[in-house]
């Protein structure tokens, strides 16, 4: 039968819908793929870690913005893990856009697109963390032993490899509005600041329970801490 999957159909079919508790999608999201293919899609992400609030919780926010229409998808993933830190929040923020791009390429609108043509497209993702950028731009390299946050880095690399288009991570300076008015900043800088604010707001709102952890391959939620999370990641 023909593929009749819409963007929302795919997102709502993913397991562990609690992961998507904060996700705002303008006009159903079916504009995402045309925006990418026309070169009008801007993507940015940023993480948050507040050890004074919790030493284990972190969050990662992301915005996908169409420059032609102004339509957006905004989201935030929250995680509570013994491995929680700022880097984990940054990695979480990078996984959201990759999952949503996968959703866009899984819709009926993508069925008739020549895959060889799609492979010629390159989508930029802007991030202020150089570790995320380095791993995101090297999706086929293996990780060194004892690599911090290896579980999420493996997911970042895996999701990148499986996308039909090319992904390029680009550095954007964080907190650019410290010395420059917001309205004078570039679009990636503005999106980065908005992601930073969103990640902090949802981090404070969420306050995840101690012992909960999330893995986003599938998607599954586990409640047995870092060891259970690592075991499931190794099964990927």
State each model region's role:
Residues 1-38, 201, 205-236:
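Charged boundary/loop elements
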Residues 9-12, 24, 51, 64-67, ...:
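Intrinsically disordered, low-complexity regions enriched in small/polar residues
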Residues 11-12, 17-116, 136-137, 189, ...:
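RNase H-like nuclease fold core
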Residues 49-52, 94-193, 211-215, 219-227:
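RNase H catalytic domain
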Residues 77-81, 160-164, 204-209:
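Low-complexity, flexible helical/coil segments
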Residues 158, 197-200:
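Ordered, helix-dominated protein-protein interaction surfaces in large eukaryotic regulatory proteins
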């Amino acid at each position: 039968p023909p593929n009749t999957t819409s963007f929302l159909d795919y997102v709502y079919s993913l397991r562990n819908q609690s992961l998507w508790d904060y996700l705002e999608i303008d006009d159903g999201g079916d504009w995402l793929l045309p925006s990418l293919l026309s070169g009008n899609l801007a993507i940015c992400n940023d993480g948050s870690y507040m050890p004074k609030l919790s030493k284990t919780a972190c969050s990662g926010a992301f915005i996908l913005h169409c420059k032609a229409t102004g339509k957006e998808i905004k989201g935030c993933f929250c995680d509570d893990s013994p491995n929680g830190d700022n880097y984990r929040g940054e990695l979480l923020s990078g996984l959201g856009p990759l999952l949503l791009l996968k959703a866009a390429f899984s819709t009926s609108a993508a069925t008739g697109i020549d895959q060889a043509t799609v492979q010629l497209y390159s989508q930029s993702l802007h991030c202020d963390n150089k570790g995320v950028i380095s791993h995101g731009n090297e999706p086929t390299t293996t990780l060194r032993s004892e690599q911090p946050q290896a579980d999420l880095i493996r997911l970042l690399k895996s999701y990148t490899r499986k996308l039909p288009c090319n992904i390029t991570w680009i550095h954007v300076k964080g907190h650019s509005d410290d010395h420059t008015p917001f309205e004078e900043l570039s679009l990636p800088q503005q999106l980065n600041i908005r992601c930073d604010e969103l990640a902090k707001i949802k981090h404070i709102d969420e306050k995840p329970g101690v012992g909960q952890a999330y893995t986003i391959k599938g998607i599954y939620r586990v409640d047995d801490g870092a060891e259970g999370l690592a075991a499931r990641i190794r099964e990927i």
